[in-house]
């Protein structure tokens, strides 16, 4: 029983550290991604799908391609 409680306590502690790290100290994030439209070209249309980890899969059928981590249609 003591082992279960210690594992549960360790898991809660890890979750607490991650919560504090992601919400209270944003400079420590592993990967900061800027998905704003400021970096998009003005002649392109946003397709509504990010391509941070996986390239444009669904919207590729519409002719969208990845540009600055956002799927856009030229």
From Swiss-Prot:
Disulfide bond residue pairs: 47-64, 51-66, 56-71
Signal sequence segment: 1-24
Gene Ontology biological-process annotations: defense response
Keyword Disulfide bond annotated: yes
UniProt propeptide residues: 25-43
Post-translational modification: Contains 3 disulfide bonds.
UniProt keyword Disulfide bond present: yes
Tissue expr: Expressed in midvein, lamina and periphery of leaves (at protein level).
Pfam families (UniProt xref): Cyclotide (PF03784)
Key words, A-Z: Disulfide bond, Knottin, Plant defense, Signal
Membership in a protein family: Belongs to the cyclotide family. Bracelet subfamily.
Function: Probably participates in a plant defense mechanism.
Domain commentary: The presence of a 'disulfide through disulfide knot' structurally defines this protein as a knottin.
Name recorded for this polypeptide: Acyclotide phyb-K
Organism, as annotated: Petunia hybrida (Petunia)
């Amino acid at each position: 029983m003591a082992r279960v409680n210690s594992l549960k306590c360790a898991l809660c502690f890890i979750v607490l550290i991650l919560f504090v790290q992601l919400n209270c100290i944003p400079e420590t994030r592993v990967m900061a991604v800027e998905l704003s439209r400021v970096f998009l070209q003005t002649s392109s249309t946003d397709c509504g799908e990010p391509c941070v980890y996986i390239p444009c899969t669904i919207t590729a059928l519409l002719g969208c391609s990845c540009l600055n981590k956002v799927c856009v249609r030229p």
